[in-house]
Amino acid sequence: MKSLILSIILSSYAFCDISIFISHNNKLTKVSHKDLANLYLKKTNTINGIKVIPIDSKNKKVFTEFYKKVVKKTPKQLHAYWMKQIYTGNTQPPKKLSKKELKKELKRNSHIIAYDTDSKTGRVLLTIK
């Protein structure tokens, strides 16, 4: 019975909405899945001509779900991608922050874009189901 309850809780968590948000001071008004994928793979550093800095979640479940839904990569594929990027000297993966660290960083830097299951963290641009 305990395992059934645990599996129900975990499966419902896997289907949580993920909010894409930015600082309240950022001028960005919309973002697409493609924009996010390119940004989080560091193929670009702007969206609609506005500079943004992607931040990853330290929460492993939220991180995995975001990359699965938006970037269409598993953790293993993502690891291989970043190893290649680092080895060839191209770029580093986005910085990872906890929710608490992220809230502080959003107040300090208006270029931050991030994701979380808590839509109250910043100004929401997009919700991923």
Briefly describe each language-model feature range.
Residues 17-129:
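Flexible loop/hinge segments at secondary-structure junctions
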